[in-house]
Amino acid sequence: MVQDLRIINEAVVPLHPTVPNPYVILGEIPPSAKWFTVLDLKDAFFFCIPLAKKSQYLFAFEWQAPGKKHQQMTWTVLPQEFRDSPHLFGQALSRDLLDLDLGPNGKILQYVDDLLICSPDEKNAQQHAIQVLNFLAERGYKVSHAKAQMVKTKVT
């Protein structure tokens, strides 16, 4: 179900997101990194980021199941079609990634909903990929298997 959020998007003061320059991010790849994994987070901008209780009323709507009365409901997670969802998602993911420690041999770089895992060798690359996938799953993030580029010396 997709809720029409045009009125909410007009009423809410827009955030002014800063999207990082991909060239700057790529400049952070350690010189020792020779193996990489790229993960694209699926349905990234919604359904995995909880809404603050004080904001949930903004996303209330009425729903009527066939043969039932109208019910008022509200989203408790970031809904699809909310204008600031990409920015809010990026902030939440960035905060979560602070808790992820790949040790001295690994580095993770984020660009919106894409992650680049950098490792010096194949063994570390495999360990880092598994560690990141488990971490993301524990936090409720979903990875697109179709777009994943796992443990490679060259990624696009």
Model-derived features: where do they sit?
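Retroelement reverse transcriptase polymerase core
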Residues: 1-156
